[in-house]
Amino acid sequence: MGINETMMFKVDNEKENEAKEILVSVHQALKEKGYNPINQMVGYILSGDPTYITNYKNARSIVRRLERDELLEEVLKFYLENHNNEPE
């Protein structure tokens, strides 16, 4: 594939649903432990360092079930679907 071609990136629906469940579960565990869940999750997604995620409620193991790019895709998709005023 040349530099002037666009690569396609795709995640199947099953992984999409799993990503939603993981994000909600990890967010709740971080919140219950008194962390800022958004900051911690951004730290994990950007760095790949699982120590940004608490072990409480097995959240660290749960978040590692999917690749970080799959989690990020779900975040972007949700944001754009809910904040895009243009019709698709």
Curated annotation (Swiss-Prot):
InterPro entries in UniProt: IreB (IPR009309)
Q: Which domain of life is it from?
A: Bacteria
Listed PANTHER family: UPF0297 PROTEIN YRZL
Question: Which Cys-Cys disulfides exist here?
Answer: none
Q: What is this protein called?
A: UPF0297 protein Ccel_2240
Which positions carry the signal peptide feature in this UniProt record? Answer: none
Family, per the entry? Belongs to the UPF0297 family.
